Amino acid sequence: MLLIAGLGNPGPQYAHNRHNIGFMAADEIFRRHRFSNWQKKFQAEIADGVIDGEKVLLVKPQTFMNLSGQSIGEAMRFYKLTPADLVVIYDELDLVPGKLRIKTGGGSGGHNGIKSIDAHMQSFPGGQNYRRMRLGIGHPGAKELVHNYVLGDFAKADNEWLDTLMGAVADNVAMLARREDNSFMNRIALAMGDGNQRPGGVKTDPAQLEKAPPKAQSHIRQARQNQKKPNIPESGPMAEMLKKLLGKKD
């Protein structure tokens, strides 16, 4: 069995928060695949289904973000799962909006939901070696702005990339069931149009790259290139005198 946990805070007031992007991903997986109805168990909303022959349990902890580990640990103990059977989906400040990364193990990066899960995973064989799917939401630019930023709603301008990302995650979730994490990340990057992007989401026209302007030259080099060559006579008395001075032979 694969347990996919999306992190967030319960309640309609938090539904569209950046901090709830994990819940959003779980909801989209639920909508695009055949799952049982949501039910309340393990201090969470859960739904079970089968993806690519693998039984999958979706979990949305209802404990609030900072206690997410209580719910996930309870579900894992009930089904006798190990950290290798767990994928956690959550928001990442240090990735630009729309970027996705998956890694097995690692630190919490200051994320309180991950801190809670890490603490509860210590009692399982394999400890903190579960898969972490980080979904980029961007950073507000200053530490003191982070709290209000993550608990703020996504802007309308974010809807296009957010809908594309959620759809791509849900459509390719079978790769997670097959443990094909690198292929999954590549598929998401293609869906998000990352192939020809500069930082900041500005797409690069390949034609512009082919016609890149020449490197700038220093003013000294330009002066040398523009300097006229001296007009040296090839015959006559002056030419003969120059040959003697320069030691030039006929």
From Swiss-Prot:
InterPro entries: Pept_tRNA_hydro, Pept_tRNA_hydro_CS, Pept_tRNA_hydro_sf. It catalyses: an N-acyl-L-alpha-aminoacyl-tRNA + H2O = an N-acyl-L-amino acid + a tRNA + H(+). It comes from Brucella canis (strain ATCC 23365 / NCTC 10854 / RM-666). NCBIfam families: pth. This is Peptidyl-tRNA hydrolase. The keyword Hydrolase applies. The active site is at 19 (proton acceptor). The record marks 9 as: Discriminates between blocked and unblocked aminoacyl-tRNA. Its EC number is 3.1.1.29. Its main location: cytoplasm. TRNA binds at residues 14, 64, 66, 112.
